[in-house]
Design a protein with these regions (language model features):
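Hydrophobic, well-ordered secondary-structure elements that form the walls
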Residues: 78, 95, 120, 134, ...
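Low-complexity, intrinsically disordered Gly/Pro/Thr-rich segments
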Residues: 128-138
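C-terminal outer-membrane beta-barrel translocator/porin domains of Gram-negative envelope proteins
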Residues: 1-102
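Short glycine-rich, acidic/polar surface loops and turns
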Residues: 76-79, 105, 115-121
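Outer-membrane beta-barrel "beta-signal"
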Residues: 117-127, 143-154
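Residue-level signature of outer-membrane beta-barrel architecture
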Residues: 28-30, 80-82, 122-124, 138, ...
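Transmembrane beta-barrel architecture of outer-membrane proteins
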Residues: 19-23, 73-75, 113-117, 129, ...
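Small/polar, glycine/serine/threonine/aspartate-rich low-complexity segments that form flexible
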Residues: 101-112
C-alpha cells in the first residue's frame, strides 16, 4: 500500500511563508500462520524552504514528534504481530529513522534514531477488526514512549 501527498503552504492563500511538505508512506503486510502478520512501513517526509518548526520530524514509536527534526526524514520499521490466543496478540517491533539535509547526514550516528518495542493487544470486535493496543517503545538517549491506542500503529 502506498500513500503520497503534498501539502502546499502559500502566502497567496494567507500564509506567512511559501513552502511544501511532501510525505511518502509505503506499507506491506505478510500474513503467516494462524492470525500472524509481519508488517513493514517505510516513511519519508521532505520539506522545501520550510520554516524550522515545520521541518521533517522523526516519526517512530519511542520518540516525541517534533523533538528531532531535519530538512528530510526517512524511516523503516518492521513489526511482528503474533496471535497467541483467540482475542489476544502481541507485537514486537524495531525501526530506524534518519534526518538529513543541510549539516545532517544518515552516515552520522547522531542523525540516526533507532527504536525497539513490544506490546499486547486485545481484539474487542474481531469481525470489525477493532483492537485495543498497549505498547512500550525505547529510543536512543533515554527516549521512550507508552502508547494506548485503538488499532495497530500502522
Amino acid at each position: 500500500m502506498a500513500n503520497l501527498n503534498n501539502i502546499a503552504y502559500r502566502e497567496s492563500l494567507g500564509g506567512d511563508d511559501d513552502f511544501d511538505v511532501v510525505r511518502a508512506d509505503f506499507r506491506y503486510y505478510l500474513s503467516h500462520g494462524k492470525g500472524n502478520v509481519l508488517a513493514f512501513r517505510q516513511l519519508n517526509h521532505f520539506t522545501s524552504d520550510a520554516p524550522t518548526q515545520v521541518n521533517a520530524p522523526v516519526q517512530l514509536r519511542g520518540y516525541k514528534i517534533g523533538q528531532y527534526n531535519g530538512y528530510y526524514m526517512s524511516s523503516i520499521e518492521g513489526e511482528e504481530r503474533w496471535r497467541f490466543a483467540e482475542r489476544w496478540t502481541s507485537t514486537f517491533f524495531l525501526g530506524i529513522a534518519c534526518t538529513y539535509g543541510g549539516s545532517q547526514s544518515c552516515s552520522n550516528s547522531k542523525d540516526l534514531y533507532p527504536a525497539v518495542g513490544a506490546g499486547v493487544q486485545y481484539i474487542l470486535k474481531p469481525k470489525e477488526g477493532i483492537v485495543l493496543n498497549l505498547e512500550y517503545a525505547l529510543g536512543k538517549d533515554g527516549n521512550y514512549g507508552v502508547y494506548l491506542n485503538m488499532g495497530y500503529a500502522y
